[in-house]
Amino acid sequence: MSVGHIEWGKFKIYHCEDSDLDGAPNLEFPFIPGSKFKAVNTGIDEAGVQVNYEDFVKGEDIVWTVSHDEVQYVVSGEAEIEYHLPPLMIETGKVVAKAGSVYLLPRGTRVVWRVLSDEPFRHLCICFPNPGYPIPVAESNKDAG
């Protein structure tokens, strides 16, 4: 019987560049026609964590269920966040997040983002463990090791 081994990560750094998201293509969330968001992978993409930089824009509500633990740090913009916590989704809440806010979405949380600001709701998503979202690496960090 073999014993699993620890997969060690590498040190990575990313400096949040507005131009990375400003130049990214508009994407649409699955199952939410008319939704619009932008996302880039920061290059921090290891077995234990994936960090993406995202914009959600005013319009359609974004409804999602996270399959991993996720911490988000808001860089700019403002959004109302409604959450429903597992296991039965009975425990719920609604908050407003804005620049400087940081929050945890525990694994299994159903979340609804409603962007309130005219500017995008720009945020860093730190996902544990790495969910493997197929997001292209930020232009400013393509050559980083």
Show where each model-derived region lies:
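Short histidine-centered beta-strand/loop micro-motifs
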Residues: 40-43, 52-53, 61-67, 83, ...
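A short, N-terminal "cap"/entry segment at the start of jelly-roll beta-barrel domains
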Residues: 1-53, 61, 141-145
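Hydrophobic/aromatic beta-strand elements that line small-molecule binding cavities or substrate pockets
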Residues: 71, 100-101, 111
